[in-house]
């Protein structure tokens, strides 16, 4: 709903911020709580 959220890595490391524009999908750009995803971490401006 907010256009952003956080991903919890499987290795238990610190949560990662994710903006909806970073989601690559052919459908709606949404993630559900508990959904498993693959991701690459990039450093950027806050």
Curated annotation (Swiss-Prot):
InterPro entries: Cold_shock_CspA, CSD, CSD_CS, CSP_DNA-bd, NA-bd_OB-fold. Induction: In response to low temperature. Residues 1-46 form the CSD domain. Keywords: Activator, Cytoplasm, DNA-binding, Stress response, Transcription, Transcription regulation. GO terms for cellular component: cytosol. GO terms for molecular function: DNA binding. PROSITE patterns: CSD_1, CSD_2. Signal peptide: none annotated. Gene3D superfamilies: Nucleic acid-binding proteins (2.40.50.140). It is found in: Cytoplasm. Homodimer. This is Major cold shock protein. The gene is cspA.
